[in-house]
Amino acid sequence: MLEDGVIVTLSDNAQSQIDIYDILQLLNELKLAGAEAISINGIRIVNTTDVALINNSYIKIDDNRLNSPYIVKAIGDPVKLESGLMQKDSGYVDKIINAMDKTAIVERNDNILIPKYDGKMTTKYIEMGE
């Protein structure tokens, strides 16, 4: 089912590369703005998703190596998501991206499809119910 939300495209440029902190900050900002589901380059992000920088050379999500551009899709109220990212001086795009001369494009979209999570959910302290 297609849903409303935003698509954020993060791209490296000649002067600066998107790094893991840019990705993590974007995920946090989207969650704070009310995102109900998020994916990066087609990989569903859940509360147990492992986002890591490997050898200071690439970003890995769970077992998937990612390269720029990073296409981040978020389902939720597109107005709230966009305004949360675009706030002057305190929003993600102005504070993180523009200040560091990186490239980010934020677009509202009403045809977003985020795949189901296909990884294994592991728990340490709870057991599955019957």
Where are these regions (language model features)?
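Core subunits and conserved enzymes of cellular information-processing
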Residues: 1-130
